[in-house]
Amino acid sequence: MKVEDKQRLERTEKMMVRWMCGVTLKNRITSEELRNRLSIEAVTEIVRRGRLRWFGHVERKADNDWVKKCTKVEVVGKVGRGRGRKTWLQCVNSDMKDLGLRVGEAQDRQLSRRKIFGETSEPCLH
């Protein structure tokens, strides 16, 4: 996810939370305080958890599975000038670093879930 997309998502979320609470910027109440009142978490954290959950799912697949092969593919050809786009795997690696996860821990489903979702919270399974 691009930084611009992340900022747009956060901005929209803040607007919606304020609208749900009937609060304007003139009331000088922080969005964090409103989120705590409603007991909701930031949408960027939900996206991060989903990304890490999908990574664990892919890592537990067999090595010859096409989904796993697609995550490891490297495109051959000329490389353009400048810094390249951040890949999905780079994003996952930075998320894992933030949470103190290692790639090998994705094999242990219970351990990775505890680290991703926290000790007490469980994901909503429909």
How does the language model describe each region?
Residues 1-126:
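Short linear motifs embedded in intrinsically disordered, charge-biased segments
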